[in-house]
């Protein structure tokens, strides 16, 4: 009996991320818009989204309550699960040989998505990967090939298979509880306790990089069994260092039937340096991007400036130029790639920006949404607010959430009386029992600011889906927004802070945002400079620090004290607050003008032409090109 369904033929696109069953960030948004495009569905009748069932978390352990397998069971259709006892024989023949070879479990099925169903493949490898310790017999040879061919040298502790007793108990555990033993809550609690008491070693690791390498072989072997049998090809779309090792495996062993595209959504090594600096310097976009600018001018590469050559993510990312096609989500990401490794400058890096979803908003709809949102705000925070600021972002250092408080410190004194009381809603997500250091520091500052009762209140909302369950929608929140804040230190593109643009909001964007150059180009086509656009304010500590003459060489930028950079950052916050107040509409007429100018800019950023004219050409391979099998594997294998 065939292992194929009628819908399972034709060209297939494979995407490995953490978002096979749920949209978490910009990458998931891109996928949703791509999947909804008829031109994409015509080019790729099959889409396979791949994820690990659970993601490694602190101390090299797992959080099984986050299992994506439950998502697929609840919101999709499961054809096969190596985590349960009984499966159709035809699917067992496909997956069990790979599971037994690598000691992993697969969950395979499909779910609804924009434009039609997609296939989903989840991989549970919690029995074979724990921190940097790996119990996968095939991995040493794969690591040796990566080292020989790509210079990738990762600090894995490769051990033999799990003892028979563990494997037997894991079998029983997954048949009863639907997870492998390595994902069992009690196992992970014991592991964390052992680490805290010094009984086990769990050094700080780039868990994503470790996971990426271990995923590559079992996922590739499963793809070989799921790939089209009608002569159609397969394209692996890699967007960051989690998915690049799978592309490398395909370059080594899948050239007959597979092509690879590296469409960089972010570059992790620069991001880490922006967020944490070198040797505890602390977060600074001004330091890193001014060093990068000088490095590119002088022909330097990242590992010549920073000690990153042993970082796993750096070793993985620097070889992405080997893929058949290379693209980037923004010109700033393309610059980061060229700084990462000089070989990215030897071939075209196609910039395909993200699109934007304009929210249909007339003046009456805006006023109605505003009434709903402000009524809720009055009930929740006890005041009749006259100005609404919003920021929706994940709890990550790179989002620069403290900069919102910096701006509010100045707005509190600059806002005219008729604009008070004002409210900033910061919508994010955190674990109440164990908030991150970043979130804990933010809450401390917010509490101190609110205690001063300046007429501007900051509300932290711990619910990423907010306002679900209330009498208004997320689109209503954007319609009601007067000022949308987004002052990230690292932002490969930056969609969130632009969502309210078409609703007439003043959008504060980061100078480091990948979207900035795209917006600047659109403004120029409209006959406006970026600085003159009434709906845009650019928060640019990078340029401000350079203009202030804080440093003039890579060495002096690296040595600059954090306190000096912080003082410059605060001056930027003051300038941003002044620009926001200057742009606030004084009456309904000016409000309508802001709505018109915001919509005019927003509608020129649609997804559809970007997908049709730029992204699909990056992903599609003409038949003659697809059949031109490179000798890469023969030359390097």
What residues fall within each predicted segment?
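Catalytic cores of nucleotide-sugar-dependent glycosyltransferases that transfer UDP/GDP/TDP-activated
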Residues: 1-637
């Amino acid at each position: 009996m065939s292992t194929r369904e009628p819908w399972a033929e034709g060209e297939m696109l494979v995407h490995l991320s953490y978002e096979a069953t749920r949209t978490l960030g910009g990458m998931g948004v891109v996928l949703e818009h791509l999947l909804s495009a008829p031109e994409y569905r015509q080019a790729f009748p099959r889409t396979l989204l791949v994820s690990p069932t659970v993601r490694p978390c602190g101390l090299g352990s797992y959080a099984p309550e986050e299992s994506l397998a439950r998502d697929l069971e609840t919101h999709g259709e499961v054809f096969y699960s190596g985590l349960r006892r009984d499966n159709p024989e035809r699917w067992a023949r496909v997956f069990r040989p790979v599971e037994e070879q690598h000691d992993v479990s697969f969950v395979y099925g499909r779910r609804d998505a924009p434009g039609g169903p997609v296939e989903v493949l989840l991989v549970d490898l919690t029995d074979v990967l724990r921190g940097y310790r790996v119990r996968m017999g095939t991995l040493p040879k794969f690591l040796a090939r990566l080292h020989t061919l790509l210079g990738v040298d990762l600090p894995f502790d490769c051990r033999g298979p799990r003892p028979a007793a563990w494997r037997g108990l894991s079998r029983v555990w997954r048949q009863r509880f639907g997870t492998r033993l390595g994902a069992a809550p009690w196992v992970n609690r014991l592991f964390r306790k052992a680490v805290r008491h010094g009984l086990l070693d769990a050094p700080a690791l780039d868990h994503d990089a470790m996971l990426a390498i271990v995923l590559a072989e079992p996922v590739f072997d499963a793809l070989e069994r799921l790939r089209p049998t009608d002569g159609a090809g397969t394209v692996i779309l890699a967007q960051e260092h989690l998915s690049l090792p799978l592309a490398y495996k395909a370059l080594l062993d899948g050239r007959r039937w597979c092509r690879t595209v590296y469409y960089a959504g972010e570059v992790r090594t620069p991001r880490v340096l922006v967020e944490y600096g070198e040797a505890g310097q602390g977060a600074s976009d001004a330091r890193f991007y001014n060093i990068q600018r000088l490095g590119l001018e002088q022909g330097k590469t990242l590992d010549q400036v920073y000690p990153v050559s042993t970082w796993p993510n750096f070793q993985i990312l620097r070889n992405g130029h080997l893929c058949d096609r290379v693209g980037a989500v923004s010109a700033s990401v393309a610059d980061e790639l060229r700084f990462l490794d000089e070989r990215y400058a030897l071939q075209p890096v196609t910039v395909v920006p993200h699109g934007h979803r304009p929210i249909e908003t007339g003046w009456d709809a805006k006023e109605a949404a505003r009434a709903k949102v402000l009524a809720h705000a009055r009930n929740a925070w006890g005041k009749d607010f006259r100005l609404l600021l919003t920021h929706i972002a994940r709890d990550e250092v790179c989002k620069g959430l403290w900069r919102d408080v910096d701006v509010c410190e100045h707005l509190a004194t600059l806002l005219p009386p008729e604009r008070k009381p004002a409210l900033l809603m910061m919508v994010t997500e955190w674990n109440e029992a164990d908030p991150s250091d970043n979130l804990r520091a933010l809450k401390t500052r917010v509490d101190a600011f609110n205690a001063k009762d300046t007429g501007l209140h900051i509300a932290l909302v711990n619910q990423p889906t907010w306002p679900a369950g209330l009498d208004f929608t997320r689109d209503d929140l954007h319609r009601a927004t007067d000022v949308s804040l987004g002052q990230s230190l690292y932002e490969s593109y930056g969609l969130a802070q632009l969502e309210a643009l078409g609703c007439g909001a003043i959008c504060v964007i980061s100078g480091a945002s990948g979207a900035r150059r795209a917006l600047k180009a659109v403004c120029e086509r409209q006959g406006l400079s970026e600085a003159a656009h009434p709906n845009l304010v650019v928060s640019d500590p990078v340029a401000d620090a350079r203009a202030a003459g804080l440093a003039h060489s890579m060495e002096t930028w690296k040595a600059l004290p954090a306190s000096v950079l912080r003082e410059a950052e605060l001056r930027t916050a003051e300038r941003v607050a002044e620009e926001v107040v200057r742009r606030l509409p004084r009456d309904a007429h000016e409000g309508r003008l802001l709505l018109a100018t915001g919509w005019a800019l927003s509608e020129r950023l649609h997804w559809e032409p970007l997908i049709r004219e730029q992204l699909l050409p990056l992903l599609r391979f003409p038949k003659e090109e697809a059949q031109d099998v490179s000798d890469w594997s023969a030359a390097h294998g």
